[in-house]
A protein has these predicted regions:
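Intrinsically disordered, low-complexity linker/loop segments enriched in Gly/Pro
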Residues: 73-161, 166, 170, 176-180
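Cytosolic ligand/metal-binding cores
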Residues: 42-44, 163-205
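Short, conserved acidic/polar surface loops in the N-terminal third of protein domains
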Residues: 58-61, 126, 184-185
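Short Lys/Arg-enriched alpha/beta "domain-start" segment
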Residues: 1-39, 122-125, 129
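Short, surface-exposed beta-edge/turn micro-motifs
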Residues: 14-17, 43-46, 141-144, 153-154
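Non-catalytic accessory segments adjacent to catalytic cores
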Residues: 22-122, 190-193
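Generic recognition of long tandem-repeat/solenoid scaffolds
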Residues: 19, 59-60, 156, 173
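Short, glycine-/Ser/Thr-/acidic-enriched flexible segments
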Residues: 24-26, 53-55, 152, 161-163, ...
Length: 205
């Protein structure tokens, strides 16, 4: 049984698991917790899933998990599909109001930068395994993960940001704000430079 099959089995049994691949690597890692316990991170070795605001961070402890790895199979079929989003006029109105409020707060110097988001609901079932295969194949330079806990939910993503890298006594992180499509020649505009500096200053403080 490969790691994707393992993940499918765990999801059906409602057991916690995480799959992840590091940037520019072709090894897929899997951590499969042996029971459905919601473990709060204290100092255990394991995979930590931390919310930005929550004081409770979840960990899959290595001492109570099966840890596996395998080469990523990139010879998979194209699983791309078009998502059909539910039309919600009220949600659009609320989001536009949120944007106006955000602009107003910036003008009032409440804060310098704000990132707004909204929830999008889709009308069809999504095969999360096929979607994750797409992430693995299409974003090889990103950290690609698929995380599930029955008491928290299922999360999937591909991020170019490096949270932390520690080598001997050197700590490295990435302040990623201004972004654009990668090309051999990149020209950063004033807007991106200012946004980048805001994040850099926040991390340093």
């Amino acid at each position: 049984m490969n790691l994707l099959d393992n993940a499918t089995s765990c999801f059906q049994k409602q057991l916690p698991f995480v799959l992840y691949a590091k940037p520019n690597e072709t090894i897929l890692h899997g951590i499969f917790q042996n029971d459905e316990t919601l473990n709060v991170f204290e100092s255990q070795s394991g995979f930590v899933f931390a919310s930005f605001y929550s004081e409770t961070n979840v960990v899959f402890p290595l001492s109570n998990s099966e840890v596996l790895q395998e080469e990523i199979n990139f010879e998979t079929e194209d699983n791309s599909f078009q998502l059909e989003t539910k039309s919600n006029e009220n949600a659009q109105i609320l989001f536009e109001k949120l944007v106006r409020n955000g602009v107003s707060e910036i003008e009032n110097n409440t804060f310098e930068k704000v990132v707004l988001s909204r929830k999008i609901e889709v009308s069809q079932q999504v095969d999360f395994i096929k979607s994750y295969q797409n992430l693995l194949k299409k974003y090889p330079t990103a950290y690609r993960y698929l995380w599930f806990h029955p008491r928290v939910g299922l999360w999937m993503g591909a991020t170019p940001e490096q949270l932390a890298k520690i080598t001997n006594n050197t700590f490295e992180t990435v302040a990623l704000a201004g972004t654009q499509v990668f090309s051999k020649t990149i020209s950063w505009q004033e807007k991106e430079i200012v946004e980048q500096q805001l994040v850099t200053d926040y991390i340093k403080s």
